[in-house]
């Protein structure tokens, strides 16, 4: 039984290139989706962040220029001091949906649209896919 995945990537991202090479090496079918041209929607991000059981911060590209120039860390810190966890997640999802460059990549989604992984750590992808 073969499953196809969607990989949300930036074309120049070296981590995305490593992830795609890993998928190719393991003959795993995928569709490439530009995280810039077709950034994740609020609905998608709400679903994926909930399914992941990860901190919302894991979904941010913390090394990106957009994250740093917009002072997103400070926004998240402020939200976490003043809002409930659910409100923080909702605010963060809204922010992530505004710009694909804010999102950590790659994002790996299964054929049914469910979250599989964020970022590329070979051991995590191996555990999830092989």
Question: Can you describe what each PLM-predicted range is?
Answer:
Residues 37-130:
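Thiol/selenol-based redox catalytic cores and closely related redox-interacting motifs
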């Amino acid at each position: 039984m073969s499953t196809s995945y969607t990989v949300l990537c930036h074309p120049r991202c070296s981590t995305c290139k490593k992830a795609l090479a890993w998928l190719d090496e393991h003959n795993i079918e995928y569709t490439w989706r530009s995280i810039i041209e077709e950034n994740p929607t609020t609905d998608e991000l709400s679903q994926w962040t909930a399914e992941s059981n990860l901190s919302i911060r894991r979904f941010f590209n913390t090394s990106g220029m957009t994250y740093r120039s917009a002072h997103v860390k400070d926004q998240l810190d402020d939200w976490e001091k003043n809002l409930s966890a659910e409100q923080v997640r909702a605010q963060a999802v809204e922010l992530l949906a505004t710009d694909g460059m804010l999102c950590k990549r790659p994002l790996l989604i299964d054929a049914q649209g469910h979250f599989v992984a964020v970022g590329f750590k070979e051991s995590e992808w191996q555990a999830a896919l092989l």
